[in-house]
Amino acid sequence: MTLVSALNYIHRTGLFGNHENKNEENLLKVSEVKNLLIVQIVQYKNSTIQFENIDIDDLNLKNEPLSVVSNSDTRILWNGPKNWLLVSTKKDLLKNISEAFRETDFAVTDLSHSRAIIELEGQNVKEVLKKGCPFNFNILEKNNSVNSTY
């Protein structure tokens, strides 16, 4: 399967904005992380299956706000009650996910072609995120996940 980025015809490389005569270390770098599997997993309200024991790439789902579980290839982010977003470099993991989560208990949706992972680098990344999201980034810790429309 060939993955095509949601930003395939939009993302351009180069220097944009007020960058002239600026120290390169002070510039914000924006890039897309490509070739990822992005899957939403939602447990139906009437499901009684215990999801904590379901193993995906040696990771288990956690139903705790802001939680993230990860290894070197896969990251599972809590997206809401019984709702997770899985991001992985293992594109063939979708078959395992579909087998692990029965259709009668879970909705599994491949979002790889409609979502993009954007990476921000630079000294003022937190300030940029604060402008577009109401979350208090001062309390954000490692392995926390935040939903935003930004």
Identify the meaning behind each predicted range.
Residues M1-Y150:
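Basic, glycine/lysine-rich polyanion-binding surfaces/domains
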